[in-house]
């Protein structure tokens, strides 16, 4: 019988308890956007559904205000 290869080590949550999801917190938002500028999925981010919803709204708001690019054209 093969045991699963999961490690017993707990992962750190991607968003710490003190961090607030806000459109002005660009360093936080950049961690959840791919190199192409796409918002990463909830499974890749390891966020709760509420956190993912708030993150999506904040990223879209930052894009409209030109704080984050819609596309990353650095080739």
UniProtKB/Swiss-Prot annotation:
Cellular component GO terms held in the UniProt record: chloroplast; ribonucleoprotein complex; ribosome
SUPFAM superfamilies noted in UniProt: Ribosomal protein S18
HAMAP family linked: Ribosomal_bS18
Protein name: Small ribosomal subunit protein bS18c
GO molecular function, one term: rRNA binding
Subcellular location: Plastid, Chloroplast
Subunit composition and interactions: Part of the 30S ribosomal subunit.
Similarity comment: family membership: Belongs to the bacterial ribosomal protein bS18 family.
Keywords of the record: Chloroplast, Plastid, Ribonucleoprotein, Ribosomal protein, RNA-binding, rRNA-binding
NCBIfam families assigned to the protein according to its UniProt record, in alphabetical order: S18
Pfam families per UniProt: Ribosomal_S18
Gene Ontology biological-process annotations: translation
Transmembrane segments: none
């Amino acid at each position: 019988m093969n045991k699963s290869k999961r490690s017993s080590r707990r992962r750190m949550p991607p968003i710490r308890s003190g961090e607030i999801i806000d459109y002005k917190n660009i360093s936080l938002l950049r961690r959840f956007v791919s190199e192409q500028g796409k918002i990463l999925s909830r499974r890749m981010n390891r966020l709760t559904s509420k956190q993912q919803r708030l993150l999506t709204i904040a990223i879209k708001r930052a894009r409209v205000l030109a704080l984050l690019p819609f596309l990353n054209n650095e080739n």
